[in-house]
Amino acid sequence: FELPELKLLVDAVQASRFITESKSRSLIKKLESLVSVHDARQLQRQVLIAGRVKTMNESIYYNIDKLHTAIGEGKQIRFQYFQWTVEKKEALRRDGGWYCVSPWHLRWDDENYYLIAYDAEADRVKHYRVDKMKRITLLEAPRLGQEKMARSDLAVYTQQLFGMYG
């Protein structure tokens, strides 16, 4: 890497809302190890982002990794899903019941990762915010929904879905 490239990566890590403060420091230290001590000092900088709060959810990195694995291996997953209460506490949806879906894509939009998956029970494509998913487990069952995914225009789906947030 050239130093300007590493500076750009450091800035992106610091600015990213889904990366916790501790994980940001850890990643930046790893980037610093790629250059001399003198150049590493230039990477020790703070990017000021207005109105930005970093996540406290350390498990998101492992969730993303599990989801990529499930997508790559063509496996179904199960997980619990939560929402935030007005008291800013996690409340599991479906009274803590499990969601079982076939993951097809991960989408990064407006500082959040979303899973786009086929829900066989509902027979439709759905999306889930990855930072609200808990206890993700890969199942041995093969992924379903190939025909439904092939028939759906993913570009139109994501534009309609994520366009309403922007």
Where are these regions (language model features)?
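Bulky hydrophobic/aromatic content
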Residues: 2-88
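A broad, low-specificity signal for short, low-complexity segments enriched in glycine/proline
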Residues: 37-42, 61-65, 93-96, 132-139
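N-terminal start-of-chain detector that recognizes signal peptides
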Residues: 48-52, 86-89, 100, 107-108, ...
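Generic recognition of flexible, low-complexity loop/linker segments
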Residues: 66-67, 103, 159-163
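Loop-centered beta-sheet repeat module
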Residues: 68-121, 126
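Surface-exposed, charged, gly/pro-rich loop-and-adjacent secondary-structure segments at domain edges
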Residues: 114-166
